[in-house]
């Protein structure tokens, strides 16, 4: 079998159409809606890419919520549990994994969460489909309603601890570390808070709404645009959002801009919902 290279961190619809049925390629459908947890699965059952398996944010891509909220609303899953789930849906260490969601819903960040989690487990062969489900349909991509039954394999995790920042890391960060809040401006400023019990942001954070990583059609902006909006030429960065989900497009965007995931491009996984679980932690409002 000829060598096959997966473009990362983004893959085009044309590449996926050409290689969709290659046995090394696995596709994760990560469509979801925070407002209605069943939306994504219903959409998947109504039509998905042939061979794609559904990756549920709550049950597959997150761990159990802890009493008191420590770890946030979408805690990182246990690495062994995530690895076992990946193996159960046919994703092995040699698999080339493509993740997609539907950016037309305004919540095009679930595929990036899946991408980041695989990278956290040490899996380099993973990419997000540029343009997602919308682009696939626009290009005439095949749609299936069959639920696949992939052969289980073994996925051995190699956890990359330096991709993650904790609340203690955020508190102890030096002046040279940039802290990015990926939520909408109103939530960052503390003017509205539709989900969490406190409004505002972590003191010292700057606001870079995750949606700026995409253009109006749901495609990812180029490396130069990402570097400009994320100040990617300089300080190491810790990025957060409400619960460690919508921050992940900014992490991918920084990688596009030349800063790979690692010590200079980390996710505060618990994010705002973890930060406010301890009332002793300070909260800021307004602009910084």
Predicted segments, located by residue:
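Cytosolic catalytic domains that perform sulfur/thiol-centered chemistry
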Residues: 1-288
């Amino acid at each position: 079998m000829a060598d096959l290279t997966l473009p990362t961190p983004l893959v085009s619809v044309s590449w996926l159409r050409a290689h969709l049925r290659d046995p090394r390629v696995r596709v994760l459908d990560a469509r979801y809606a925070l407002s209605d947890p069943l939306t994504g699965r219903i959409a998947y059952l109504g039509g998905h890419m042939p061979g794609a398996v559904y990756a549920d944010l709550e049950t597959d891509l997150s761990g159990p919520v802890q009493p008191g909220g420590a770890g946030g609303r979408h805690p990182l899953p246990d690495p062994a549990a995530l690895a076992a789930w990946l193996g159960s849906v046919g994703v092995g260490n040699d698999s080339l994994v493509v993740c997609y969601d539907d950016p037309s819903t305004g919540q095009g960040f679930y595929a990036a969460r899946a991408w980041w989690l695989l990278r956290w487990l040490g899996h380099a062969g993973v990419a997000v489909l540029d343009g997602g489900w919308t682009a696939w349909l626009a290009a005439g991509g095949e749609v299936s309603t069959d639920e696949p039954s992939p052969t289980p394999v073994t996925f051995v995790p190699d956890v990359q601890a330096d991709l993650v920042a904790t609340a203690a890391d955020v508190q102890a960060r030096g002046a040279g570390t940039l802290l990015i809040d990926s939520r909408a401006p109103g939530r960052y400023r503390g003017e509205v808070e539709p989900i969490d019990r406190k409004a505002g942001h972590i003191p010292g954070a700057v606001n870079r709404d995750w949606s700026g990583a995409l253009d109006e059609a749901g495609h990812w902006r180029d490396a130069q645009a990402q570097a400009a909006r994320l100040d990617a030429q300089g300080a190491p960065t810790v990025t957060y959002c409400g619960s460690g989900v919508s921050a992940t497009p900014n992490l991918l965007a920084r990688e596009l801009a030349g800063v790979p995931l690692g010590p200079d491009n980390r996710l505060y996984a618990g994010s705002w919902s973890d930060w406010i679980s301890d009332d002793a932690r300070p909260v800021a409002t307004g602009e910084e």
